Amino acid sequence: MKYGIVGYSGRMGQEIQKVFSEKGHELVLKVDVNGVEELDSPDVVIDFSSPEALPKTVDLCKKYRAGLVLGTTALKEEHLQMLRELSKEVPVVQAYNFSIGINVLKRFLSELVKVLEDWDVEIVETHHRFKKDAPSGTAILLESALGKSVPIHSLRVGGVPGDHVVVFGNIGETIEIKHRAISRTVFAIGALKAAEFLVGKDPGMYSFEEVIFGGE
């Protein structure tokens, strides 16, 4: 598979390149603040950079008819509309978290909340000091799995890649469910699965859950 990275020189860009190269995939498009280096036509473009970069990313996907794996957070409605339009021409996977564990947790929460429907629920998320958006896209994703609005508490400290704790409470007992991303590698592995999934797919919007669980 030939692939491109938007945000190539960033921390996630470097992690993505490492994971993809270990599987023998060829990096043919590099995009960062210094410009664009085009070596060949990519099958898939990976973008974990910023919402501001999305218009350029969309243009590149259209130019090469390349699928898009988008892990950028803090997207607004205008960005989502751009993705919907792009998905008419190429296959797109957009997710706020490409950790397999988080997406398994999301599915679990959607079932658990049916049993604990009268319990209090709150979410606590912790990320590194450089993360700009709060609450995190992942916390919002987990809230959506609960099917209702719940309090979300955001901490920005040190170099934490990402901790998410969902706390259920009732009189006399609590349940805490925690997911911890130990390194950015987990997100790069998820991006790899999504990219390989997209190769040969018809245009359309695909969820990361479809990548993991298929049609279940």
UniProtKB/Swiss-Prot annotation:
For this protein, the activity regulation entry reads: Is inhibited by high concentrations of NADH.
What GO molecular-function term can you cite, just one? NAD binding
Catalytic activity, as annotated: (S)-2,3,4,5-tetrahydrodipicolinate + NAD(+) + H2O = (2S,4S)-4-hydroxy-2,3,4,5-tetrahydrodipicolinate + NADH + H(+); (S)-2,3,4,5-tetrahydrodipicolinate + NADP(+) + H2O = (2S,4S)-4-hydroxy-2,3,4,5-tetrahydrodipicolinate + NADPH + H(+)
EC number per UniProt: 1.17.1.8
Relate the activity to temperature as described in the entry.
Is stable for up to 48 hours at 80 degrees Celsius. Has a thermal denaturation midpoint (Tm) of 95.7 degrees Celsius.
Which residues of this protein are catalytic?
A: H127 (proton donor/acceptor), K131 (proton donor)
Instruction: Keywords in alphabetical order, please.
Output: Amino-acid biosynthesis, Cytoplasm, Diaminopimelate biosynthesis, Lysine biosynthesis, NAD, NADP, Oxidoreductase
Pathway(s) it belongs to: Amino-acid biosynthesis; L-lysine biosynthesis via DAP pathway; (S)-tetrahydrodipicolinate from L-aspartate: step 4/4
- Record-level GO BP terms: diaminopimelate biosynthetic process; lysine biosynthetic process via diaminopimelate
Among CDD domains, the record links this protein to: DHDPR_N
Please describe what this protein does.
Catalyzes the conversion of 4-hydroxy-tetrahydrodipicolinate (HTPA) to tetrahydrodipicolinate. Uses NADPH as a reductant with much more efficiency than NADH.
Q: What is this protein called?
A: 4-hydroxy-tetrahydrodipicolinate reductase
- Biological source species: Thermotoga maritima (strain ATCC 43589 / DSM 3109 / JCM 10099 / NBRC 100826 / MSB8)
